[in-house]
């Protein structure tokens, strides 16, 4: 019975993180055409660090699908894969880099997640499906670096919140 309660609690927390990701990426977003500045990956990264790589992938992919449907976009599986890969890669990196200090571990996990998910996979999808030129896609690199830095700072604050961590670990 305790496993069922934990499972329901975990699913509820992940669903809240999906909702937060949708709001952060679709509503609280600054768009410049081909680059969007938003914190939609923050809940994805939080899920990856707290609940593991599978949860990070699920939150990223589900938030991308639901957010795309709500915005009226056609679902692009490669872009959805990129959104999920941010959480998957960050979660695996967080687990494997456990000998590093927390700050360095967090920075490396977030940077690797954004590099694979946003810079590589999503940029490739934008090039293949929508014909974006590589030169235009290069602007995504500083965007990912800035968002990674902001995400690291915010994640560090969230991970130090005892109430949040107690709620997540129950």
What are these regions (language model features)?
Residues 1-170:
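Loop-helix junctions at membrane interfaces
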């Amino acid at each position: 019975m305790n496993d069922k309660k934990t499972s329901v609690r975990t699913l509820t927390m992940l669903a809240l993180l999906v909702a937060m990701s949708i709001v952060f990426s679709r509503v609280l977003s600054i768009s410049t055409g081909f680059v969007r500045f938003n914190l939609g990956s923050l809940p994805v990264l939080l899920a990856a660090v707290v609940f593991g790589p599978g949860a990070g992938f699920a939150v990223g992919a589900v938030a991308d699908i639901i957010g795309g449907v709500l915005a009226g976009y056609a679902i692009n599986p490669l872009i959805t894969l990129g959104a999920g890969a941010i959480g998957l890669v960050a979660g695996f990196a967080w687990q494997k880099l456990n000998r590093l200090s927390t700050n360095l571990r967090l920075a490396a996990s977030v940077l690797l997640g954004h590099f694979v998910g946003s810079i590589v996979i999503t940029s490739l999808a934008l090039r293949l499906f929508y014909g974006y030129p590589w030169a235009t896609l290069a602007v995504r690199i500083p965007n990912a670096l800035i968002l990674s830095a902001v995400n690291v700072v915010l994640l560090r604050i969230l991970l130090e919140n005892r109430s949040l961590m107690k709620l997540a670990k129950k």
